[in-house]
């Protein structure tokens, strides 16, 4: 067990206590096949080193660990929404990396419509008995479309019955909305992580089964 205390990067009046407990490792090859849809915020607020550039580097790490039986998709949202990468086998790493390299920040944040599109993409690539998960990567600054907390949570909660979970990955500071990220993950039967460095946490969350 390892503990660490540090100031919260989004509020210097708050402290974070990190408790790390090492459990039994489960070989990646033993995990069910994964259908991962990364819903990436590419709005203007993500255009800083600790946001989109860090996210892209983390995604490349994940792509390198994907197996041929795994599928990865990229959905982006800013003023509008786009499927930047259709469901692609983990064996096609160059194709995945090229799509990641093409991500650019700019525009406002239509997060709700992005969530809807991500669920459609996840359903199309659904793997029965596999890990079917949307990973929402954002600084939490939703400012276009459905912006009411309850509406967003209800939207995600309605979709969890489809067997597709939603986890959230928080990046950066400033407009970062920790409360919304935690509540969306809870509603989506997923987990929440704050990513401030190139850590394994993002990889573990993507590869884990269930919460």
Residue ranges, per PLM feature:
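Conserved P-loop/Walker A NTP-binding site and adjacent catalytic elements of P-loop NTPases
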Residues: 2
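Exposed acidic/Ser/Thr-rich ligand/metal-binding surfaces
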Residues: 6-211
